[in-house]
Amino acid sequence: MNKSRREALHSASSYIEKALDIVNDARYDEQDCIDNTPENLQSSERYEAMESAVDNLEEAADSLKEALHYIEKAVE
């Protein structure tokens, strides 16, 4: 792989790392809301939506980590 492509992929990795930080921040904030939800509201539709959001954000974070891994392997 030539230098120009490697540099472009390093740049892409930086953007993905920033995206990963944003996704993780949102996931941690949403999980904090779940953890602080009163017990009487834990059966609510909103609570279930928050749990689903956390699960989806966790999947997104895993996918971003996987993308970083494959980019790193490609640049080697």
Q: Across the structure, where does each feature detected by a protein language model lie?
A:
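Long, low-complexity or tandemly repetitive, helically biased scaffold regions used
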Residues: 1-76
